[in-house]
Structure formats: C-alpha cells, structure tokens
A protein has these predicted regions:
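A conserved segment at the C-terminal end of the G1
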Residues: 1-15
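Hydrophobic/aromatic ligand-binding patch that stacks against planar heteroaromatic rings
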Residues: 5, 52, 87
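Acidic, Mg2+-coordinating active-site environments of NTP-dependent enzymes
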Residues: 8-11, 23-25, 32, 36-38, ...
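A short hydrophobic beta-strand->loop->alpha-helix junction that borders the nucleotide-binding pocket
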Residues: 17-21
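Switch II of P-loop NTPase G domains
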Residues: 43-57
C-alpha cells in the first residue's frame, strides 16, 4: 500500500515485496525515490539464522503486528521479539519507527530504542488513530496527534487494511 501511495504521488519508489502489488508489473523495482521493503522475521539462510530484516538497515520502520509465527524457526514469541529488538536497534536515531499498539510490540520497544516512535491506535490523543464509519472499514476517519483529520472511502474492507492505510499515511 505504501508503494502504491508513493507511486501515485510521482515519487517513483523502489520496492521489494513478497507479491506483485496492485498496479505494478513485478514484485521488485529499483526506482528513483524512497525504497520500500516488505519484510518478516524469517531467517536469512541455512548458514545465517538471523532474521532477513536485520540486513536491510532501514531509516523508517513500520511494525503492524507481532505474533508467534514460523514455529519451524522460533521456539516462542519471545524468540521473535528478540529478532524485532535487533531490527529496532538497527534504526538510526535520525530515523523513525511507526508501531501499532500491542503488548508484544510494547515489549520490544521497552527493551531499548533510540529512534523516535509514532504510535498507532492506542486510544491516546497523542497517537495516530482511526475510527470506522461503517462496520467493514470501507469508510473511516484518520486522526493525527496534531488534531488533523481525514476521511477515507475506498473499495477495500477490513480493519487490517484500514490499519495498513493509517501506517502508510
């Protein structure tokens, strides 16, 4: 979604995404503008058991969710949180982390973070939030910590899509 927004704004983003994004011809492109990577915590290779995402060295990180996955690689949620902590520590102090509110993500950030963090949907007026205008999230309102508001009506449905849109904004 972020790649699509950047493209529509004429920024010609580079990207590496697990599938072919809507409106694009492939799953990767070098581009001329910002570079977007869709990444997860799966290990890099049989000889490098670190999560792939620690090799990317991002300036900006969006963490939408963190849950137990990849039981073939990780023993438990704590093992995954450790990998996310390594990722968070890769972001420079001049960077930016955008993170949704969850106990699992909070635990990672509480382990140590020197990067400014914007929080999503915590219920606090100091954070970014969204409010559904219909039960399917086909219409919703976004609010910024500064009090700015914007309404979105689109053809997608589901809270997860609305949350992705909020993170992209």
């Amino acid at each position: 979604m972020l790649t699509w927004i950047l493209e529509r704004e004429g920024l010609n983003p580079g990207f590496l995404i697990g599938g072919v994004p809507f409106g694009f011809e492939g799953s990767a492109r070098l581009g001329q503008g910002p570079f977007v990577v869709e990444a997860d915590e799966y290990d890099s290779a049989f000889f490098d058991k670190r999560s792939k995402f620690v090799h990317y060295k991002p300036q900006t990180l969006v963490v939408n969710n963190l849950e137990f996955d990849h039981a073939d690689i990780f023993a438990d949620l704590n093992a995954i949180q450790t990998q996310f902590h390594h990722l968070v520590r890769c972001i420079p102090s001049s960077g930016h982390i955008i993170a949704s509110k969850s106990d699992a993500i909070d635990e990672v950030l509480n382990r140590g973070c020197w990067t400014p963090v914007s929080r999503l949907y915590t219920g606090s007026p100091d954070d970014w939030s969204l409010q559904a205008r219909d039960k399917h999230f086909g219409e919703f309102e976004i609010s910024s910590p500064a009090g700015d508001r914007g309404a979105i009506t689109w053809g997608l449905i589901g809270r997860h899509n609305a949350e992705n849109a909020l993170a992209a904004v």
